[in-house]
Amino acid sequence: MRGQSRGKTMYVVPYLMAPPGSPLEPYAAGVELTDNRPVVLHMIRMARVAVAHLENLEDPATFVRAVHVTGDLENLGQGTPEDQRYFVTVADQRTILHFGSSYGGNALLGKIAHGLRQACYDGRASGRFLAEQFMLLGIVDKQTGAKYHICGGFPSASGKTNLAMTLAPDALGVRYHVEFYGDDIAWI
């Protein structure tokens, strides 16, 4: 990674992957350094981005330190024995290092690296939550007011998003309403 961003603009993105004030806030704060402007724009869209999220932490030392360096994508030997890319999460040090990609999950470090890998460690170590690659939805019976929450654990590219965004079938009429909570990663 050393020297790979020479001559490029480095961006500092302070972010929060949970609602401010939630019980999960201490595990959700991070700072991503990246040399990739589209990564910054996508992080702004995907997460809560502001310095205030770090300033409001009870223990400011707990934020995740994430570094993404795009690298020379054409010459990194992807898919060969000489592959120079690496994607590392050192969970007990709250550190993420990704080199050699501009692909979403490998560049938007708040998502898979922090939101899933780091959070799996944090949840287990704290005993306070579970982080999984789940979709979450709710089904409301408008007639009775009953609400059912459904959690589905599926691997990537298996239909979590399609299922999470489903509508009640026409055969059930207007009695049921489906609420979308999330389609990829859940902290429960």
Where are these regions (language model features)?
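Conserved internal helical-beta-strand scaffold that buttresses enzyme catalytic cores
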Residues: 1-158, 168-188
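Hydrophobic positions on the alpha1 helix immediately C-terminal to the Walker A/P-loop
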Residues: 163
